Regions:
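Membrane-interface extramembranous regions
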Residues: 1-73, 77-142
Length: 142
């Protein structure tokens, strides 16, 4: 057990698992944005908020597609980040911005639910991945 713990402590397994988790989340939710069930699920959440500007600019479906494109860019950048830290940095920043944008809806929604509160985790995850990718990109050792 001690050997396993030492191997784990010296490895990047935690970051790999964290990155894969976020990739899966953004891949799933980014893909969902192209389907009517998600378009309709987002409508009551987005309509009363400042994000309604997406509906004004692109329509209800177009607003959902826009979010899908952003989430697709995010998971692709995070995936490429395994090999190119600069791409990972882009993905990490979008993860953080996504969390901030979604959390900014709280005052207008007037309630806390799982749609919004999960984004607290995105701030933390994005920050951890950003630090890791910046260190790799700048060749900074611990």
């Amino acid at each position: 057990m001690k050997k396993f713990i030492n191997v784990y402590i010296k490895s990047d397994y935690d970051i790999v698992i964290l990155r894969l988790s976020v990739i899966i989340i953004f891949m799933l939710f980014g893909t969902y944005k192209w389907f009517d069930f998600e378009v309709m699920a987002l409508k009551p959440l987005i309509s009363p908020t400042w994000l309604n500007i997406l509906y004004i600019m692109f329509g209800v479906h177009g607003g959902s597609y826009f979010l899908g494109i952003v989430e697709t860019i995010t998971f692709l950048a995070l995936s490429i980040g395994f090999f190119r830290p600069a791409a990972g940095i882009l993905g990490d920043i979008i993860v953080i911005v996504t969390g901030l944008v979604t959390l900014s809806l709280l005052p207008q929604l007037g309630k806390v639910d799982s749609f919004v509160i999960k984004d607290v985790l995105l701030l933390g995850v994005g920050s951890v991945l950003l630090k890791y990718d910046l260190k790799n990109h700048l060749n900074i050792k611990n």
